[in-house]
Amino acid sequence: ADKEFQHPYFFQNTYSDQNLYLGHGTLRHVESTALCDYELNRKYCRGIDIDIFVLDGFIENPVLRFFHRTATMIVKKSLRGYVADLNDKMKFDKRLIAWASKGLYRFVSYKKAFAFYEQLFRMVDADKSERVSVLAYRYSSHRRIRKRSSYNEQVWIPFENVVYPAPSDTHDALVCYFGDDYMTPLHLPTAHGRRYLDATRPYQEVVEELKQHPEQFAERIKLLYTD
């Protein structure tokens, strides 16, 4: 996918960017900005993005699923620990994992470790699984787990002057992800917290400005997220 997009679009994943772990793909617009306050010193692209998720096969046997989930979580935590900034505030156990992971990946490429992480999910054939989910992104045994047959047919749904493809049982999908009351409007930050958004300037320019004037981040957030 990284060869399909040209500037200003950039397909971002663990392989394509620096010091980054992602359990999914992201399509970024590099001439824009979407960043959280903890991302000011990160090296990876922080343009406005669209997330792209792969559906993984769900293991129905609870014993096999336990061992599979445990194995993937060990690798995932080590990868997250490696890319973590030790200057950030974090709990003692996460800091310990980060120290250990940074030592480990001096000898082993963390991108090779991520390839192994992906292979753990490929071991479960999604085409033959009764249910699927975005397990590489968030491994849950009770949420976001849906029947594979739900994706056999699509319907097109209008939303804000754009038409989107969706599973035929869209209502069930929305309940699965957001709960029974998903239609009630809520004034909340994004799933990533309060982000600094600028559709007109590249993130490199915004980052340098915010490093010089960090108070502008709070001012921008107040403007974006306050009624």
Regions found by a protein language model. Name each.
Residues 2-60, 68, 77-178, 184-227:
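Conserved catalytic core of two-metal-ion nucleotidyltransferases
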Residues 64:
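Short acidic alpha-helical/loop segments enriched in Asp/Glu that coordinate divalent cations
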